[in-house]
């Protein structure tokens, strides 16, 4: 649904009784101030927005001031962004945000907050993969498509040993990453740079049982947001209340997926399997196989497919192994082939499409 949002509120709509803000930067034409949570606030375990005050010279003797509020919406409510929100929770989000602002000695009227200008918005979707598929496998498959041709995205990179795929420009970006693996990355390597202590604590109980693929569309500039909304038939210049919308989130996320992935989907399923592709499929089909066993089975299948197949392989090994061991090798080959035959090449893709079509909020299976 919605994740990070950046709001802009004019200074004359903000009450700040105590001007104990830190001066972050200064020139003759502007000043930048920041307000950070106190140690007591941090120890509370609550999530707080990032506040930045701008004071710019707008005329010869005139200055304009505004407050920038940046925060992850689900973290306000759940202290993590694996759980997703629905439209009915907007009132609770506003209540919580007003509370956090008040704790920072910043006061804004409810109506002014709901109608605040949106400078940037991140829409996202968490997708739990099943049937042995891993986020890293899906990311490696998506990396086979030349996505730069589908959008004005100028840079592409794999990050964190293939655990994330990042397509971006300054104005917008499309990120696909392994959400569970990202929970334990440090701030320099993590995709989510603003992890809460509670969110990081989720890694241990989830790492062995859940594979969560995260799609994230970051509209980092208002001009890009408006251009996209216009293209999708959505009103331009939305305020905070208007961007908090499942309909808008679904439209944006599906637009990026359909334009960048769906139109290239044939490329995902038409290539011949490499040795590494086969290894990945064996790890999915043979869920209990250890790494060494999976490598052995991959080599066995590749050797069985080459030349004259099993007959040539038997002749090559004749002086090294007896009949009993050979029959065991054949049994391994038969069992592995059965498992691979049950795999459907598009299964992981269909799982993603099903979630994007239903677009139901994702929630963690259990909470403390």
Q: Which residues make up each language-model segment?
A:
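Structured, helix-rich domain cores that form ligand/interaction pockets
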Residues: 1-317, 340-368
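Helix-turn-helix DNA-binding segment
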Residues: 324-326
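Residues in the recognition helix of alpha-helical DNA-binding motifs
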Residues: 329, 336
């Amino acid at each position: 649904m919605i994740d990070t949002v950046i709001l802009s509120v004019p200074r004359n709509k903000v009450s700040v009784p105590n001007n104990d803000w830190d001066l972050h930067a200064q020139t003759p034409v502007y000043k930048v101030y920041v307000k950070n949570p106190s140690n007591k606030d941090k120890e509370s375990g609550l999530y707080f927005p990032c506040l930045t005050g701008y004071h710019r010279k707008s005329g010869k003797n005139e200055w304009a001031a505004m407050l920038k509020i940046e925060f992850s919406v689900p973290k306000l409510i759940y202290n993590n962004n694996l759980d997703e929100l629905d439209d009915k929770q907007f009132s609770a989000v506003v209540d919580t945000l007003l509370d956090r602002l008040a704790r920072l000695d910043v006061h804004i009227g409810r109506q002014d907050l709901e109608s605040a200008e949106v400078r940037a918005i991140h829409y996202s979707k968490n997708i739990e993969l099943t049937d042995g598929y891993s986020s890293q496998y899906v990311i490696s498959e998506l990396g086979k498509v030349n996505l730069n041709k589908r959008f004005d995205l100028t840079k592409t990179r794999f990050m964190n040993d293939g655990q994330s795929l990042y397509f971006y420009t300054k104005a917008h970006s499309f990120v696909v990453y392994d959400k569970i693996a990202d929970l334990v990355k440090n701030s320099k390597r993590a995709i989510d740079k603003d992890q809460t202590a509670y969110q990081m604590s989720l890694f241990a109980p989830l790492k062995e049982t859940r594979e969560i693929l995260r799609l994230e569309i970051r509209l980092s500039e208002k001009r890009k947001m408006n251009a996209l909304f216009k293209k999708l038939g959505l009103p331009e210049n939305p305020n905070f209340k208007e961007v908090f919308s499942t309909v808008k989130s679904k439209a944006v996320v599906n637009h990026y997926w359909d334009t960048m992935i769906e139109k290239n989907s044939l490329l995902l399923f038409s290539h011949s399997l490499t040795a590494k592709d086969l290894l990945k499929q064996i790890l999915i089909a043979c869920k209990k196989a250890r790494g060494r066993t999976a490598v052995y089975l991959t080599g066995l299948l590749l050797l069985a497919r080459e030349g004259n197949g099993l007959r040539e392989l038997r002749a090559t090994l004749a002086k090294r192994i007896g009949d009993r061991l050979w029959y065991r090798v054949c049994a391994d080959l038969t069992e592995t082939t059965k498992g691979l035959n049950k795999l459907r090449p598009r299964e992981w893709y269909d799982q993603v499409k099903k979630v994007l079509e239903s677009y139901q909020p994702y929630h963690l299976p259990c909470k403390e």
